[in-house]
């Protein structure tokens, strides 16, 4: 009996969560999967894929939501999207497909599946991101070492980092002077919301600094469906999504961004500079 059949037989008698979370021999096949990253966090997955991945890079990791549920993190053009993978105890569910074994699940990815979400963004899963990457063992020598502050304690040493929280997709935007509606490609990264003429445009039309935004909310004043607005001191931007689900996703992540910005401001963590630039 081959290794795959042996482990497949074990899969039918093991608790579903054990197959994915245990570190002993019962989860050998999963641990041998080079692009399974275990308990890698959502933030770390986004940082890895954005900094060192490319369009179509992906990795599998444990979900922090519930046992038996896992996340496939996928690098799109300027964002990272996350999709659920579920092990039911008898099969693996991903997207519209269900796989009776881990072998079939992995084989599906070997054939570079095409997937799309509510935003309409299509992605080909081409590049599994490895858990282990070779790096040179080179270290720098410390030549200068002094303290820039005095009298501080461990209570003053608070680790901080901005969330990446990326999203991208087409939205229809109302013009500022001429109130016509045009479809633009939007990208959200850190505290910047950029919009471009289309997905292939190298330079944004405008960068909106979300630290200046006071509110994000559904809007019913424009006689359009799936519309929401971003309120800035200098202007209110009206945007429309193709579906209600997509509009809700944008509102949720933008509101979450604003809550994180306010939290940082209230805690006095760093200086956030204003960067609302108009290029054309």
From Swiss-Prot:
Kindly list the positions at which Phosphoserine occurs in this protein: 141
Q: How is it modified after translation?
A: Phosphorylated on tyrosine residues.
Where in the numbering of this chain does the PH domain appear?
164-259
Q: What induces it?
A: Upon B-cell activation.
Q: Does the keyword Cytoplasm apply?
A: yes
Q: What GO molecular function annotations does the UniProt record carry, in alphabetical order?
A: phosphatidylinositol-3,4,5-trisphosphate binding; phosphatidylinositol-3,4-bisphosphate binding; phospholipid binding
Q: Which residues carry this modification: Phosphotyrosine?
A: 139
Q: Which GO cellular component terms, listed alphabetically, does the Swiss-Prot or TrEMBL entry include?
A: cytosol; plasma membrane
What coarse category fits the chief subcellular location reported for this protein?
cytoplasm
Q: Which branch of life, at top level?
A: Eukaryota
* A UniProt-annotated Pfam family: SH2
Tissue expression notes: Highly expressed in placenta and lung, followed by brain, heart, kidney, liver, pancreas and skeletal muscle. Expressed by B-lymphocytes, but not T-lymphocytes or nonhematopoietic cells.
Locations listed in the record:
Cytoplasm; Membrane
Q: What is the effect of changing residue 61 to K?
A: No change in BCR-induced NFAT activation
This molecule's function is given as: May act as a B-cell-associated adapter that regulates B-cell antigen receptor (BCR)-signaling downstream of PI3K.
Q: What interactions and quaternary structure are annotated?
A: Interacts with PtdIns(3,4,5)P3 and PLCG2. In vitro, interacts with PtdIns(3,4)P2.
- By what name is this protein known? Dual adapter for phosphotyrosine and 3-phosphotyrosine and 3-phosphoinositide
């Amino acid at each position: 009996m081959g290794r795959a059949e042996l482990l497949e037989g074990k899969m039918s008698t093991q608790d579903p969560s054990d197959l994915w979370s245990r570190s002993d021999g019962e989860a050998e096949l999963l641990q041998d999967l080079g692009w399974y990253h275990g308990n890698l966090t959502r933030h770390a997955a986004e940082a890895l894929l954005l900094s060192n991945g490319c369009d179509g890079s992906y990795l599998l990791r444990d979900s922090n939501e519930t046992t038996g549920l896992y996340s496939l993190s996928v690098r799109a053009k300027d964002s990272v999207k996350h999709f659920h993978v579920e092990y039911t105890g008898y099969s693996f569910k991903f997207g519209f497909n269900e796989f009776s074994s881990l072998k079939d699940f992995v084989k599906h990815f070997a054939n570079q599946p095409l997937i799309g979400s509510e935003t309409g963004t299509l992605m080909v899963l081409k590049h599994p991101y490895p858990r282990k990457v070779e790096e040179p063992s080179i270290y720098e020598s410390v030549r200068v070492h002094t303290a820039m502050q005095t009298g501080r304690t461990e209570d003053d040493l608070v680790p901080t980092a901005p969330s990446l929280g990326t999203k991208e997709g087409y939205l229809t935007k109302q013009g500022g002077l001429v109130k016509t509606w045009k479809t633009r490609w939007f990208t959200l990264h850190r505290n910047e919301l950029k919009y471009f003429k289309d997905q292939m445009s190298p330079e944004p039309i405008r960068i909106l600094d979300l630290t200046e935004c006071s509110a994000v909310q559904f809007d019913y004043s424009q006689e359009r469906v799936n519309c929401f607005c971003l309120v800035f001191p200098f202007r209110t931007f009206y945007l429309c999504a193709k579906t209600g689900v997509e509009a809700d996703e944008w509102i949720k992540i933008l509101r979450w961004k604003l809550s994180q910005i306010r939290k940082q401001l209230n805690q006095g963590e760093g200086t956030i500079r204003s960067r609302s630039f108009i290029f054309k």
